[in-house]
Amino acid sequence: MNIHEYQGKDILKKFGVSVPRGIVAFSPDEAKQAAQQLFEEQGSPVVVVKAQIHAGGRGKAGGVKLAKSPDEAMEIARQMLGATLVTHQTGPEGKQVSRLLVEEGMNIDREFYVGITLDRSTSRNVLMVSTEGGMEIEKVAEETPDKLLKIQVDPLYGLQGFQAREAAFFLGLEGEQFRNAVTFIIALYNAYMTIDASLAEINPLVVTKEGRVLALDAKINFDGNALFRHKNFLELRDTNEEDPFEVEASKSNLNYVRLDGNVGCMVNGAGLAMATMDMIQLAGGRPANFLDVGGGASPETVEEGFKIILSDKNVRAILVNIFGGIVRCDRVAGGIIQAARKIGLNLPVIVRLEGTNAEIAQKMLDESGLNLIAANGLHDAAAKVNQALAAG
């Protein structure tokens, strides 16, 4: 689960991570009041007005601007709120701005990158620091790997002081700046672990000319599987920033990711779902979604899955690919029949069922009187999907 920058900073601040003073605003008047308060309290010559969306690249897209007065902050807010911000991460459709973060300006000396995430290749958390602050870390790793330091963290011992010092030394910091950076990195790691985050990224981490070390931007992603331990964080979810189909699917405990193809997929199991999408692509089609109905698929979840798939107007055919291990194929078949009759499926539906009660399921489909295309194996299913698309 992703959250906004200002929400992430509020959480990090509780763990001792230094962040600039900021106030969230939902209207131009609130932005003016926030700026006035910051000018009076902080004595900064400028404030920064930042669009709050779940995407990076806001600065280049005009979503981060300086204001030298409360009135200027209000005018910037008028322009930003309700506008659609298009960045390299939003796609061409962009994201609408509904809230702003008004923040004190910083007297920046240097910018760095600090991030913590899980390295799945080693099954360990990894601390990453770079001297190239403000840039995409993937680009830095590819083009200038010598400017990126990765430190593997032993899960039994956690981040050690010498590792935090190694990171600060790599950034070329000395004296008070060095000590502040070490404190910052340790606090960030403690926050990352305590809140069960999957990513804690500070880009940029800034060092001011006064020696302060602060998170100028913060991106926090939560591990969705651990949210049951942090139910208060669920209140931070902004569904307006998410795909509406994915939000609807989550209500039925369906794992759904929308893609830009024309073949709807309904599968049980993430591995089988990815293999199914690969086969569709190889056969000449394009998957329209990733939809995993899970191991406990019921007629109701299958019906809900069809509704979500059909809400995508780009879908021209549907492939149901179920391997009945935990789930019984006859229950899935019942859901397909129920959905077809209730919703009125008017698209080609190719069905491949293997495993527990597959014969019973196939008989149910054959006797349903519905126009469902049976497939024998994954290759055959993908081929029949392509034939259905070609036919029209």
Curated annotation (Swiss-Prot):
| One GO location term (cellular component) | succinate-CoA ligase complex
Q: Which reaction does it catalyse?
A: succinate + ATP + CoA = succinyl-CoA + ADP + phosphate; GTP + succinate + CoA = succinyl-CoA + GDP + phosphate
- Per its UniProt entry, what is the enzyme's top EC class, as one word? ligase
Q: Which residues bind Mg(2+)?
A: N203, D217
Q: How is the cofactor bound?
A: Binds 1 Mg(2+) ion per subunit.
EC number(s) on file = 6.2.1.5
Pathway it acts in?
Carbohydrate metabolism; tricarboxylic acid cycle; succinate from succinyl-CoA (ligase route): step 1/1
> Which cofactors?
Mg(2+)
Reading the lineage from the top rank, the first entry is Bacteria
Annotated positions binding substrate: N268, G325, I326, V327
Domain ATP-grasp intervals: 9-248
In the record, what terms sit under GO molecular function? ATP binding; magnesium ion binding; succinate-CoA ligase (ADP-forming) activity; succinate-CoA ligase (GDP-forming) activity
SUPFAM superfamilies recorded for this chain?
A: Glutathione synthetase ATP-binding domain-like (SSF56059), Succinyl-CoA synthetase domains (SSF52210)
A GO BP entry: tricarboxylic acid cycle
Alphabetized, the UniProt keywords read: ATP-binding, Ligase, Magnesium, Metal-binding, Nucleotide-binding, Tricarboxylic acid cycle
Subunit notes for this chain? Heterotetramer of two alpha and two beta subunits.
Report the protein's function. Succinyl-CoA synthetase functions in the citric acid cycle (TCA), coupling the hydrolysis of succinyl-CoA to the synthesis of either ATP or GTP and thus represents the only step of substrate-level phosphorylation in the TCA. The beta subunit provides nucleotide specificity of the enzyme and binds the substrate succinate, while the binding sites for coenzyme A and phosphate are found in the alpha subunit.
The name under which this protein is listed is Succinate--CoA ligase [ADP-forming] subunit beta
- Tell me the lineage of the source organism: Bacteria, Pseudomonadati, Chlorobiota, Chlorobiia, Chlorobiales
Q: What gene does this protein come from?
A: sucC
